[in-house]
Amino acid sequence: MKTISSLAAIFVIALFASPAVASEQVPFNGSWVSHETYDVQFPVMFVHGTATGYATRIGRYTATYEEQVDLLTGSSVGAITLVAANGDVVFATQTGQGDPTPDPDIFSIVEVSTITGGTGRFVGATGTFTIARLVDLTTGDSSGSFSGTISHPAP
């Protein structure tokens, strides 16, 4: 009877310990190269973009993003979708801030992205990452990097 009670206790502990292990935060860092187009309807600028890069936990990826920028403050809100080479997806919402640089055509952009889920191995994913990039507003070309953390259920 004592053995059965011990086995039952181990099973219960393992059952409740598994979700904690699955949600462990791990580094999520990557490169960022993008191109975006703009639709200005003052005082809002709508941004439509595509990006490529390489990231930990995802490998090579492509991304699409949509943002609304308040031209009076430089702040933005939006959403981003990252697609891994195998088709697994990470979804995130983001808030950002754009600031001018000494070159009037170049802006420094910092965006904080909150992971809201995904598909494939990223179902239930959570975490945050910060994208820091420079964008040339005359061409729409942008480059930078991101860093943060991601958690997702174990495979």
Say what each PLM segment does.
Residues V21-P155:
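Beta-strand-enriched cores of mature, soluble protein domains
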Residues M1-A8:
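Bacterial N-terminal signal peptides that target proteins for export
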Residues A17-P19:
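N-terminal signal peptide c-region/cleavage motif recognized by signal peptidases
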